[in-house]
Design a protein with these regions (language model features):
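Interfacial loop at the N-terminal end of multi-pass membrane proteins
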Residues: 23-48, 67-70, 128-136
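Juxtamembrane helix-break-helix junctions at the cytosolic face
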Residues: 58-75, 93-96
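Membrane-helix boundary connector in multi-pass membrane proteins
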Residues: 86-105, 123
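Core segments of alpha-helical transmembrane spans in multipass integral membrane proteins
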Residues: 10, 14-23, 38-66, 79-87
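Sequence termini and other peripheral, non-core segments
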Residues: 1, 13, 86, 90, ...
Length: 140
C-alpha cells in the first residue's frame, strides 16, 4: 500500500508542474485579458492555491506515507484525497461533457488519483474495523 501512496505523491507533483504551466499551455497571458480584473485575479489565485494543495498532498504522500497508512488522521487524509480526485472526475463529466478525447483521458487520469488514494484508504480502514473483532476484546 505504501507504493500506491508514494505513487500518489508523484502523481500530485505531476499536477503541480501541469498547473504551473497553465499560463503557457492555455495562453493565459492573452486569454485572461478578456476577463474582468476580478475574474482574471480569481482564476490565477484559484490555480495557484490548488497548485499548493497538490504540493501538500504530494509532500505528505512521499514523506509521511507510513503515517497516512498507520494513523487515524492519516486514514482520514487518504479518504479525503481519494474523494478530492473522485469529485474532480465527476466535475470533468459535468463541466467538460466528455465531448473531446482529451476530456475522456483526463477523466481517466482523475479516476487514477481516486484509486491511488482510495485503495490504501480502504485497506487502512478495514483493519481498524477488524481489530475490534480480533479476539483482543469483546465482540460487539
Amino acid at each position: 500500500m505504501e507504493v500506491l501512496v508514494k505513487a500518489g505523491g508523484i502523481y500530485c507533483f505531476g499536477f503541480v508542474i501541469f498547473h504551473l504551466m497553465f499560463w503557457r499551455i492555455f495562453n493565459w497571458g492573452e486569454d485572461l485579458k478578456t476577463l474582468s480584473f476580478l475574474n482574471r485575479a480569481i482564476m490565477q489565485v484559484v490555480n495557484l492555491s490548488l497548485t499548493f494543495a497538490f504540493v501538500i498532498f504530494g509532500y505528505i504522500s512521499l514523506f509521511h506515507s507510513r503515517a497516512l497508512l498507520e494513523t487515524a488522521l492519516g486514514h482520514s487524509l487518504l479518504v479525503l484525497m481519494s474523494l478530492f480526485w473522485l469529485l474532480r472526475a465527476i466535475q470533468q463529466v459535468v463541466f467538460f461533457k466528455l465531448k473531446h478525447w482529451g476530456s475522456a483521458i483526463f477523466l481517466g487520469v482523475f479516476l487514477l488519483g481516486a484509486v491511488l488514494y482510495g485503495v490504501p484508504a480502504g485497506n487502512a480502514i478495514y483493519p481498524l474495523q477488524q481489530s475490534a473483532h480480533s479476539g483482543l476484546g469483546p465482540r460487539l
